[in-house]
Amino acid sequence: ICTYMNDVEHKEKYLKMKEFIREHLEKNAWDGSWYRRAYFDDGTPLGSKENIDCKIDSLAQSWSVISHAGDLEKAKKAMSFVEKYLIDDNLNIIKLLSPPFEKSKKEEPGYIKGYVAGVRENGGQYTHAATWVVLAFAKLGMGEKALKYFNMINPINHTKNKDDCEKYKLEPYVMAADVYMREPHGGRGGWSWYTGTAGWMYKVGLEWLLGFKTYKNEGYKINPLVLDSLGDFELEINNEKENYKIK
């Protein structure tokens, strides 16, 4: 914004601030294998191996990649622990955090603890954040993983047969805001027709997996991230100035 407004003074100020934040994130937020989520007022970390609940949170890991603020090797390591602790191949969900808030008596994170453990933000799949996990793998150039997890959270793949539909209990054509983790409701969708996830899924699928990006007044570039796995595909571009069909 500062560049667009030709505001040199504030641009320089914020660039210095950015480097200050980056330096101190690496110094104070790295937990040894992943990034911590936050700190309580008394200095107790959240999203740390020290915690009883919420030892790891996906947001700090995915955004270390998306923001380009995290050290690249640390960010890659952090995303490997997202796979280990937050991706559930049995339920086909990507949990927001683990373990859910339910055991610790000391740490009070706020309203999130009001949800039953394994529901919505409290240890279930919060799909907005799950999409950022997909984007993070895409931005790391790990196309096969990005495609795998894109398909994992795609609602059509939670409704392939009658048993799936009875478990998921939502529409196959819209994104669920959340998916439960805890049995006997594991794999059940929560709210639908509600989440900004839809826009992120569209963006990740089109711009990163298919590699279609627009450049103002310069045209388009197509560089698929996972061409072999995707196979042939077709794009149509229709607006007031042009109509293209690209195969």
Model-derived features: where do they sit?
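Acidic, mature catalytic/reactive cores of soluble proteins
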Residues: 1-247
